[in-house]
Amino acid sequence: MTGMHDTIFALATPPGRSAIAVIRISGPAAHAAPALFGAACPAPGCFQVARLLDNSGMPLDEALVLAMAGPRSSTGEDVVEIHTHGSMAVTAAVLRMLGDAGGFRPAVAGEFTHRMFANGKIDLLGTEALADLIDSETDRQRLQAWRQLDGALYKPVTGWREEMVRLGGRLEALIDFADEDLPPSVEAQLRDDSNALIRSIEGVLDDGRIGEQVRNGVTVSLLGPVNAG
């Protein structure tokens, strides 16, 4: 991944003809981007309608400009979004002017998400869930991705870690006081609690295998006589 201190930009909506196109800019120089088009940058957390001008001063489009200040933004950096009409000519001109201006560069694939992760806006499980949500094609895939994005796996993992620490402390105490006359129930309870933790982890792993099938689909072979229907 290239420099984290660069100001990057990219088309955040699918390319092609559409009603609206969103150009996202993130980095230390993001709030200077609207000035390239003869527009003022709104205050952080605000938006305004602005007429964008090209390098010759001719109108390019009328757009909605939003500004967010780091760390209170999606990437944790200063962010500007320019919402233009979804004309391929307009978006190409805006991207070209940003690239030619100096101080801005096109983002590489996944770089906005990488900055979200690097700045603590999302964890590793969240980045995987976000990718799954974007790629989802069915309601079940969407719901599974959203559950993971909402912490469905993070929460039990955190609980397992806390339980392991507690069990480790109890096991150390049992070893340290092995020569004491401890009741058998102490060791039995530790064993039961450890087995309960193992069953909890195994249950989530089993669900994970089902989740892989939901995410990737299932390969099915249809077998039968030729021209059977």
PLM features per residue range, with description:
Residues M97, A152-W160, V220, G224-V226:
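Short secondary-structure transition/capping segments
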Residues R105-V108, E163, R209:
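Hydrophobic alpha-helical segments, principally membrane-spanning helices and signal/leader peptides
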Residues M1-L143, R147, G151:
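A glycine-rich (often HGG/GG-containing) alpha/beta subdomain
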Residues D6, R17, A21-S26, L36-A40, ...:
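Conserved G1/Walker A P-loop phosphate-binding module
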Residues K121-S200, V204:
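Long, non-coiled-coil amphipathic alpha-helical linker/lever segments
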